[in-house]
Swiss-Prot record:
Catalysed reactions, as listed in the record: (S)-malate = fumarate + H2O
Pfam families: FumaraseC_C, Lyase_1
Name of the encoding gene: fumC
SUBUNIT field: Homotetramer.
Full protein name: Fumarate hydratase class II
Length: 459
């Protein structure tokens, strides 16, 4: 153990760790739960700390010599080499102060080590005076939230969702001439093609991609430079813009300084907005995954209109059973994301005066929603969607036996007579054609001409 100090006094810290006194106090005071700060968020902190020191050098606030050590430490942090030094829990101060200081202390001590100094000495690099220069926890944490979410959505969610959309679009075209019975209210309905059914899934995902791309730019607004309450106290007038420009350059994402820092600190409306879009995506994916597992149900006593890949044994007691596991995993992800949105919505409503103090729980839930949806889309695509095949025999059986084909007769003999045909066929267990002929409403040739599934699906 080594001794480190802060404004409250001296405390022992594990000698092999780069974090310092404030991080150690957080470990003691907030031994709550198992949820630690996500590594993606820590990486984003590394990006903003690097941008801050680059800016402070340009503005003449930090010497290039000190900056070089800080920059090296930031680069190691960004690369994930220092992840073992970030043990703090989500359940801490609502501004994320302990995590901001955890980052400051780790960067400071690693920079000190690189400079040949003694860990905990705060020389030549001080965690507050140098690493945290021109910053506050109140503006760094929301900035890190935005960087994390924007990067994950850009580089993970959108690509994986696009691949799934493309696969379903390919299936829609592949199934374009396979006519099947439709279902509404879980009851038989008029026909459509399997391709048309899948085109609905494609449209849903297209709409979600549009919505995601629409809200993504709201994350580009950064709070950095607002410091404690949004006034920018203790910062150079050019710091906010220059730092945001550096973040944009480091990430390849067009981040910029928020025009109103008071809103950027006191509210997290952008996070609530993005989470709402992710919830909508979860609802869409839930519908798609549910449809696919129902359509694949069976193999002999279910709907069975499609066949999905057999990935693993499905039962420890029933030999040969194969379950729709990818759909089940996807739907569990969806309910988690919907729950996360509820948490984020409530947390987002709780800003008081100049600060919202629910930031860590909002960050944790949003990050989880993004990576769960990203991973689930990739998994569902690779292990289910690409291998979907039609069961033509089952499809034809249902189509030929459906009473709802009688709908095609509405314009010829009227709704009431068509309904009479359907009820007679159902009650007596005959075909629609047999019932129509027995009632004398149509001839055989008239029935065959009118009741043609191909004419009913607009292909």
């Amino acid at each position: 153990m080594r001794k480190e100090s802060d404004s409250m006094g001296t405390i022992e810290v594990p000698s092999e760790k780069y974090y310092g006194a404030q991080s150690q106090r957080s470990l003691i005071n907030f031994a709550i739960g198992r949820e630690t700060m996500p590594p993606e968020l820590i990486r984003a902190f590394g990006v903003l700390k690097k941008a801050a020191v680059l800016t402070n050098v340009e503005l003449g606030k930090v010497s290039q010599e000190k900056a070089n050590f800080i920059l090296k430490a930031c680069e190691e942090l960004i690369a994930g080499k220092l992840n073992d030094h970030f043990p703090l829990k989500i359940w801490q101060t609502g501004s994320g102060t302990q995590t901001n200081m955890n980052v400051n202390e780790v960067i400071s001590n690693r920079a000190i080590e690189l400079a040949g100094g003694k860990l905990g000495s705060k020389e030549p690099v001080h965690p507050n005076d140098h690493v945290n220069m021109s910053q506050s926890s109140n503006d760094t944490f929301p900035t890190a939230m935005h960087i994390t979410a924007a990067e994950m959505i850009t580089h993970q969610l959108i690509p994986n969702l696009t691949v799934l959309r493309d696969t379903l679009e390919k299936k829609s075209k592949e199934f374009s001439e396979i006519i099947k019975i439709g279902r509404t209210h879980l009851q038989d309905a008029v026909p459509l093609t399997l391709g048309q059914e899948f085109s609905g899934y494609v449209a849903q995902l297209n709409h979600n991609l549009e919505a995601i791309n629409d809200v993504l730019p709201t994350l580009y607004r950064l709070a950095l430079g607002g410091t404690a309450v949004g006034t920018g106290l203790n910062t150079h007038p050019q710091f906010a813009k220059k730092a945001a420009d550096h973040i944009a350059e480091l990430t390849g994402i067009p981040f910029y300084s928020a025009s109103n820092k008071f809103a950027a600190l006191a509210a997290n409306d952008e996070i609530v907005l993005v989470s709402g879009v992710l919830k909508t995506l979860a609802c869409s994916l839930m519908k798609i995954a549910n449809d696919i597992r129902w359509l694949a149900s069976g193999p002999r006593c279910g709907i069975g209109e499609i066949v999905i890949p057999e990935n693993e044994p499905g039962s420890s007691i029933m030999p040969g059973k194969v379950n729709p596991t990818q759909s089940e995993a996807m739907t569990m992800v969806c309910v988690q994301v919907i729950g996360n949105d509820t948490t984020i919505t409530i947390a987002g409503s709780q800003g008081n005066f100049e600060l919202n103090v629910y930031k860590p729980v909002m960050a944790y839930n949003l990050i989880q929603s993004i990576y769960l949806l990203s991973d689930a889309c990739r998994s569902f695509n690779d292990h289910c969607a690409v291998g979907i095949k039609p069961n033509q025999e089952k499809i034809n059986d249902y189509l030929n036996n459906s009473l709802m084909l009688v709908t095609a007769l509405n314009q010829i003999i009227g709704y009431d007579k068509a309904s009479e045909i359907a009820k007679k066929a159902y009650k007596e267990g005959t075909t629609l054609k047999e019932a129509a002929l027995q009632l004398g409403y149509l001839t055989a040739s008239e029935f065959d001409k009118a009741v043609d599934p191909k004419k009913m699906v607009a292909i």
